[in-house]
Amino acid sequence: MPRTRAVVHTFHVAALGVWLGSLLMTGVAAAILFPTMKGLDPKLPAFAEYTGDHWMIAAGRAADRIFSINDALQLACALVVVVTLAAGAVWCNLRPTGLRGVLRLLALCVALVALGFQLFVLAPRMSLNLRTYWQAAQAGDRPLADRHQAAFSTDHTTAQNTLATITLAVGVLLLLSVWPQGLAAPTPPTTPPTPRPAGDSPLEPPALLKGLR
């Protein structure tokens, strides 16, 4: 059973680590990609009739792949986290208890609710607006492209806040999962007993002997 507990806990922590790492690296990639592409200011032959910013389309195409991979990783990691938490509670007596357990469950619920909102509400709507924007831009329909780009940008702020919430919740959950249960109270230093002189008795001498001394 101790080995099973260790395996379950290891998978739980590993899934949280991959989940958090995926979120952080996705944010870093986006923060690097868009300014770099803006500085390059490419002109895309496939969008020759579009008079808007081509760098935004080029960066968006690359970022869309990155965020799609991140979404898949998040979903897989969330499933592993939930399964290992349930398996640990049922078979390995790894039930979250006390304030620490309440905080872990709260962080997990926040992460799962935010992830569900991201995957099943925001992502489909943003994907539809993004692809319509690209199609309109490729056809040279600037008004339609601008309209869907604006709709995408409106959701983009919400998506950023949602991903930040997931990152914070997963980070807290990971910290609580690996933090030691508690620190033992320090043991006071023991002073070795003072040796008694030879011939000294630890017993109180009788009163009669005291009077004779």
Regions found by a protein language model. Give the residues of each.
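Interfacial loop at the N-terminal end of multi-pass membrane proteins
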Residues: P2-V13, G17-R95, L128-Q149
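Cytoplasmic juxtamembrane regions at transmembrane-helix boundaries
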Residues: V81-L106, S177-L203
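Short, charged juxtamembrane terminal tails flanking transmembrane helices
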Residues: T191, L208-R213
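Alpha-helical transmembrane segments and their helix-start/interface "positive-inside/aromatic belt" motifs
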Residues: R3-G21, G101-A111, V170-L176
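Individual transmembrane alpha-helices with interfacial aromatic-anchor signatures
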Residues: I66, D146-T167
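Hydrophobic alpha-helical transmembrane segments in integral membrane proteins
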Residues: F120-N129
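A hydrophobic membrane-anchoring alpha-helix module
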Residues: T165-V172, W179-L183
